């Protein structure tokens, strides 16, 4: 246990140590003067700060922070904080009007040791100390808190301000001043008289660079041009833009220099390129930047001020928010305002319309409509939903008549109709020959699977579109080298393809014979498959599709054949009468049953029920 004598000796030692410790002088002091605190204007103002009509007294706390943001008072006060003394005791008088409350005497002073930032945030709290018969002593409670951000240069005059917190109103003044030997708007330059002795002891280096500018200006190098040169240290000569040389008397030749900025080059006499203080335009809110010999200067537009035009002097009373924006704050020119924009607008003053449709929120080709308060999508047919995200079934509840098939797509149903029917729902009778598809006078015949053209003499093709002998020459391919025009092998196909076609013909013939179950079809099939020489497959000869020619090559009998009127066949059918080999040609589907057998000794004509090659076997 420490004795009273030892305790007193320890206290004296601590006090002496604190006295003789080296004290760091502050760069400056922020001073706050409270003028009045009381009920604000308007209805509902309180009559007394004291609760239950007990006596109370007020005191104030200030917290300073650098930067542009107003922060909570509980966070660290980077620039410092101060607490005032207690004010006079106040007791409410019944029936008396609410007066301004008695305030503590003196200033609230916040010393700062670093450079003054220029732009700062403040939080001022008003506390109430109740002096009734509380158990445990007085009780403290927060009565009001105001905050703001300001632009303030050190060394300037007092600035006045009014802030309201709920029903209370606070009027105050503030300033920032430098403590000698610090000078300047940021208290960063040190100044001492020329005759002042050194602050440091013998053999010690200077504590900080001192500038002799209190009594006399700096003395530059002898002969330094006063118009084109300047100095920041005694005995130097630094040139302004466009001038060079030891004394800044030589103009820079712009014809051979890359940039008129930076230190001069001893070899070329030009200025070496370097970054400038206005590069990137440090001035905000549309301010214009101009370089000075030592830094830059911003010329701010109307309504803004500050070193970089970062502080707005416009208040909510000026109506700065457009398009129905709500203005908050900005009670005086030194406080900032904030615009809360309605949906569809953005910007510091709600001056920019948000193009929400540029994000293409509507799917499946829907049309985006920005109504300001809401976004709407106009969907294409066949789609639904807030963003047209649902694909509707176009064929639901819709049927196509007469065997038609519903095809979905394009936001509407479409019917693919069977042959002979048309219209939206296949309810209308349609004639495939109504459009006259057969060219050059050909006759059109309707069929259950399509249409067939009977061509006029001299034309051929599915639609009679090809002349048989254009300009006196055959329209069929020319004979291969080494073959004569009349040679039966003139249009001979490759052997492998011929075998493949022959096998296909035989299989198709057997299948048709079995399906139709005609008694004479077996004999015809036997004659086709038995006793027939190795067939060869050829391209069509000149006698093709409506060409009259003479058949008789080989050992068979010669007869005149009319290709427009085949024997023993309905005139609507189209056939190819064979030579001693198998010929192939793509033609339209015939009109009648798939097999026709002629009389004994005559040729058999094989007709297929689907679009295919019409073949005949001798």
Curated annotation (Swiss-Prot):
Cytoplasmic side: 514-618
Domain called EGF-like: residue spans: 216-249, 274-310, 312-351, 353-389, 391-427, 429-465
Post-translational modification: Ubiquitinated by MIB (MIB1 or MIB2), leading to its endocytosis and subsequent degradation.
A Pfam family per the record: EGF
Cell division among keywords: no
SUPFAM superfamilies given in the database record: EGF/Laminin, Growth factor receptor domain
SMART domains per UniProt: EGF (SM00181), EGF_CA (SM00179)
UniProt keyword Cytoplasm present: no
Coarse class of the protein's main subcellular location: membrane
Sequence ranges on the Extracellular membrane side: 27-492
Subcellular compartments: Membrane
Limits of the DSL domain: 176-215
GO biological process, one term: Notch signaling pathway
Entry membrane topology: Single-pass type I membrane protein
InterPro entries in the cross-refs: EGF-like_Ca-bd_dom, EGF-like_CS, EGF-like_dom, Growth_fac_rcpt_cys_sf, Notch_Cell-Fate_Det, Notch_ligand_N
Subunit text: Can bind and activate Notch-1 or another Notch receptor.
Comment, domains: The DSL domain is required for binding to the Notch receptor.
Function, in words: Inhibits primary neurogenesis. May be required to divert neurons along a specific differentiation pathway. Plays a role in the formation of somite boundaries during segmentation of the paraxial mesoderm.
Protein name as it appears in the record: Delta-like protein 3
Organism for this UniProt entry: Homo sapiens (Human)
């Amino acid at each position: 246990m420490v004795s009273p004598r030892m305790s007193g000796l320890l206290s004296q030692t601590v006090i002496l140590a604190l006295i003789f410790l080296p004290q760091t002088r502050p760069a400056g002091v922020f001073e706050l003067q409270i003028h009045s605190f009381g009920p604000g204007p308007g209805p509902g103002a309180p009559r007394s700060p004291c609760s239950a009509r007990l006596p109370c007294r007020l005191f104030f706390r200030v917290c300073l922070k650098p930067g542009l943001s107003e922060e909570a008072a509980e966070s660290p006060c980077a620039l410092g904080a101060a607490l005032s003394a207690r004010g006079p005791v106040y007791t409410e008088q019944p029936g008396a009007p609410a007066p301004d409350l008695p305030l503590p005497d003196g200033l609230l002073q916040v010393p700062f040791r670093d450079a003054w930032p220029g732009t700062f945030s403040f939080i001022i709290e008003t506390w109430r100390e109740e002096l009734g018969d509380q158990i445990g002593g007085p009780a403290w409670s927060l009565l009001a808190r105001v905050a703001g951000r300001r632009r303030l240069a050190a060394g300037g005059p007092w600035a006045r301000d009014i802030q309201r917190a709920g029903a209370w109103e606070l009027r105050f003044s503030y300033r920032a001043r430098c403590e000698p030997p610090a000078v300047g708007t940021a208290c960063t330059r040190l100044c001492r008289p020329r005759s002042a002795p050194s602050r440091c002891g013998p053999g010690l280096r200077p504590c900080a660079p001192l500038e002799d500018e209190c009594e006399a200006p700096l003395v530059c190098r002898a002969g330094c041009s006063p118009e084109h040169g300047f100095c920041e240290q005694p005995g130097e000569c630094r040139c302004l833009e466009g001038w060079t040389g030891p004394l800044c008397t030589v103009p820079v030749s712009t014809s051979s220099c890359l940039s008129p900025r930076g230190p001069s080059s001893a070899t070329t006499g030009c200025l070496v390129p370097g970054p400038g203080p206005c590069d990137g335009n440090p001035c905000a809110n549309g301010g214009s930047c101009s370089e000075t010999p030592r830094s830059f200067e911003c010329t701010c537009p109307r309504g803004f001020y500050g070193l970089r035009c970062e502080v707005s002097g416009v208040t909510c009373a000026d109506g700065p928010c457009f398009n129905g924006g709500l203005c908050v704050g900005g009670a005086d020119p030194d406080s900032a305002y904030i615009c809360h924009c309605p949906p569809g607008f953005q910007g510091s003053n709600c001056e920019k319309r948000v193009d929400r449709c540029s994000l293409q929120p509507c799917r499946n080709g829907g049309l985006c409509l920005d109504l300001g308060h809401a976004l709407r999508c106009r969907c294409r047919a066949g789609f639904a939903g807030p963003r047209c995200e649902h694909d509707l079934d176009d064929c639901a509840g819709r049927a196509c008549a007469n065997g038609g098939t519903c095809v979905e797509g394009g936001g509407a149903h479409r019917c693919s109709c069977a042959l002979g029917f048309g219209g939206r729902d296949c309810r209308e009778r349609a004639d495939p020959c109504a459009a006259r598809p057969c060219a050059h006078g050909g006759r059109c015949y309707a069929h259950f699977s399509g249409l067939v053209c009977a061509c006029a003499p001299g034309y051929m093709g599915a639609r009679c579109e090809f002349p048989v002998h254009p300009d006196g020459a055959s329209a069929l391919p020319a004979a291969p080298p080494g073959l004569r025009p009349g040679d039966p092998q003139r249009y001979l196909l490759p052997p492998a393809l011929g075998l493949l076609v022959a096998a296909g013909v035989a299989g198709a013939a057997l299948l048709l014979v079995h399906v139709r179950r005609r008694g004479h079809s077996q004999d015809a099939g036997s004659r086709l498959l038995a006793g027939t020489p190795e067939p060869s497959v050829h391209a069509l000869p000149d006698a093709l599709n409506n060409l009259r020619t003479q058949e008789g090559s080989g050992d068979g009998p010669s007869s005149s054949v009319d290709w427009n009127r085949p024997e023993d066949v309905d005139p609507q059918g189209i056939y190819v009468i064979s030579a001693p080999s198998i010929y192939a040609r793509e033609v339209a589907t015939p009109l009648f049953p798939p097999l026709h057998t002629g009389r004994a000794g005559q040729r058999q004509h094989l007709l297929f029920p689907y679009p295919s090659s019409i073949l005949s076997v001798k």
